[in-house]
Amino acid sequence: MLPSSMPATGRLLPTQQADGHTQMALDAWLLKRSNGPVLRFYRWDGPWLSLGRHQRHWPEHWNELVRRGRLSLVRRPSGGRAVLHAGGLTYALICPDAPRRRQEAYRQACQWLIDGFQDLGLPLHFGSDPAGGEANNCFASATVADLVDPCGVKRVGSAQRWQNGRLLQHGEILLDPPAALWEEVFEEAAPAAAPAQINRLELDQRLRQSLVQSWSHCPWQMQPLKADEVQELEVELASGSAL
């Protein structure tokens, strides 16, 4: 549950499909502009590899894959390591006044996911691997920021960004990772797909409902972007100042 000081109304945005630059710019813009909690789900136009905000080094062959048109590269406003966005579902959750302790912040920001997947018949638990490590791949380990399924597969990887007392939590829900591309990028076998019982077409709606139920003290409203918000975002995208 979110802190009682949270503003009275939360904002739900419709699920969107767009290129990586637009998606990351929108999340950064929402973090700067939103005074209340926000949740949105989205998918990516084509395969994208997102780099963590502070990730400065990555394998040279990733650049070659970009040159060959196998994927596109973008930097996230959140931290963490590289995530391959293909065959999955991404979420962005913005929380004002979230707990400053990292583990507690992740716990509060992930419980609705645990509840939602439990209702779908897939129990998840927090990871226990130590933070850090040398792997470039976010899904190479599962820390207390991540959610793991009963088979030991990291099913949700999360990363955070704090700005002016607001928390942005990014999460990638691993559903159907592309085996060939995953091996090209990370030089290891792709994780197993999510169980067939997880309805890919309805997952965003079901998890959205889980958040509303879990944070029932806060009324939520579906509020698509307004025309002036779209215009402001386009200006920031054009200027390159969004992140």
Predicted regions and their residues:
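Short beta-strand-to-loop capping motifs
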Residues: 53, 93-97, 149, 175
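Aromatic/basic-lined ligand-recognition segments
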Residues: 142-148, 152-160
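Long, positively charged amphipathic alpha-helical accessory segments at protein N-termini or as interdomain linkers
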Residues: 100, 111-131, 161-243
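Residues forming anionic-ligand binding surfaces in small-molecule and nucleic-acid pockets
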Residues: 77-96, 184-194
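Active-site loop/lid in soluble adenylation, ligation, and acyl-transfer enzymes
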Residues: 1-60, 64, 68, 72-76, ...
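Internal, conserved structured core segments that host functional sites
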Residues: 87-144
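Short acidic-glycine loop/turn motifs at beta-strand connectors
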Residues: 45, 149-152, 163-164, 177
